[in-house]
Amino acid sequence: GLALGTTADDAQGEPNGILEGIPAQTLVRKHIPGFTLDEMRAALADDSARYASCGITTAQGGPAFSPMDAELGHKVTELVLDCAHDGTLTIRTVLFIRANDMSRLAPYPNHVPGTDLSGNGRVTMGAAKLWADGDPRGHTGYFLEPYPFVDPAKGADYRGEFLYTVDELVEKILPIHKAGWQIAIHANGDGGIEIVTQAYERLQQLHPRPNARHLVIHCQYPSYSQLQRLKAAGAYPCFFISPLYHWGEIHAGYVGADRVARFCPCHDADELGLPYNLHTDAPITPVDPLIQVCTAVTRTSRKGTVYGPDQAVTAMSALRAVTIHAAFLNFEEHVKGSLTPGKYADMVLLAENPLTVAPEHIKDIAVLRTYVGGDVVYSRS
């Protein structure tokens, strides 16, 4: 597969200082001093408080708790578990582990998704995380058709970049699948999503595993047929919809307004009976689930442009995506996601009802209190 990382060149072929993708950025990152564990502990405390103030009771760690340095990744995981016991971590966290290969996963024998790693329900095991393509805003999201407006240096047929062919991806993730891990793969463009979809289909052909619940992370530009095939393979989309609100016009300029009309097609998923979640990919976009809910309902950017109104969903559908469906995708629907006897008393008190306010006002609703396990972890002064 292509190495998803280059140094950008100007018209004369000279480097212009832009580093595209993780491998290229690593050239600089390895010279930047890392954070100490004490600094990470302080950051966990700050972030936990910030998430709670937005009404979030469970956050996913993404690969943040498993950096490229495997040894450091394990130390950070131990720090998170320690913070779950000393009160530093006030909300619940699901750990996603960077899965460059099986050796990165070896330190995590309790890898069944949803496993309580901390013993108090604060930290649970999530998925093994990989990447298939880049980001459309950086012209690295991989599409089946060329970008309509792109740097001439990349050529008229440029479709973005991918990390693996289907065969390469299957070879990498089949052992992970056989070992019982949940797998989560970053894919934005319909080309990247196609590679991941074919790989998930192949996994189930080679080693059938009911209820694997593999994920496509971000899944910004899937076709209807790709969503159908994901459902048939027992896989699910995790829609990164907030860029439609923050940068809808930028996406339209990069990939075309017709494509953006199908950005994170929640209505299609609802029509197919395919559960999905909504996420912020923080710090890429601000931590605020109500912006995600509002965007799924209105399909409107902050500048007021509406993209793909036929993909709008009801407020109830969007709320399910950040509650019970999010819990389901984490294998935690038995303890989270709804106010049901026997589940954790994790809940949020809002100043207004998102089901009855004007749809465009949902994003402005204030969070009054956030509860985790029945305890108040945030209260608006």
Per-region residue spans from a language model:
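Non-cysteine beta-strand/loop elements that form the S-adenosyl-L-methionine
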Residues: N120-T140, A235-L244
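Accessory "access/gating" subregions that flank catalytic or transport cores
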Residues: T115-G119
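Basic/polar N-terminal segments that are highly enriched at the extreme N-terminus
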Residues: R380-S381
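Divalent metal-binding segments
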Residues: G1-H111, G126, L130, D135-G192, ...
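His/Asp/Glu-enriched, well-ordered alpha-helical/loop segment
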Residues: A42, L174-A184, G191-H214, H218-C219, ...
